[in-house]
């Protein structure tokens, strides 16, 4: 938008920045001395899925260290290092985040990962399926069947509702036996 560090008025209508509004009817918020920016996006945060639940199982005491009581507008939640889904959503929102990307979803754990993400309030969410060690992908690549690999990945992304492919050390687990 060509704006870089300028001080100016911002008009908002229905949650979107617009050219202008009726100033006589508008609510005025004095944000002098503050930075105004759109909601934050965390492109790599492990907040749902198999690895998070393994962490919760390994840290049962974590649920007693940091309890958030129910309020008139929030549910209760727990957790210090591995918070519950509701606590996670509330804390991200308090920090100004609006969007998170969960970076590791094993395809066979997709349903549960999406259930947890759906249970996390106040955030737009997406997840990256782990396909770098997916056996079908490795076989297609080994046999130089690139178009079939692409078709399989496209089908997989649709079937498990992935946003982008997470590839970590492609073939690494397979190489180690």
Which residues are covered by each model-predicted region?
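Histidine-rich, glycine-flanked metal-binding segment
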Residues: 2-38
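General beta-strand structural signal in soluble alpha/beta enzymes
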Residues: 29-30, 101-102, 127, 167
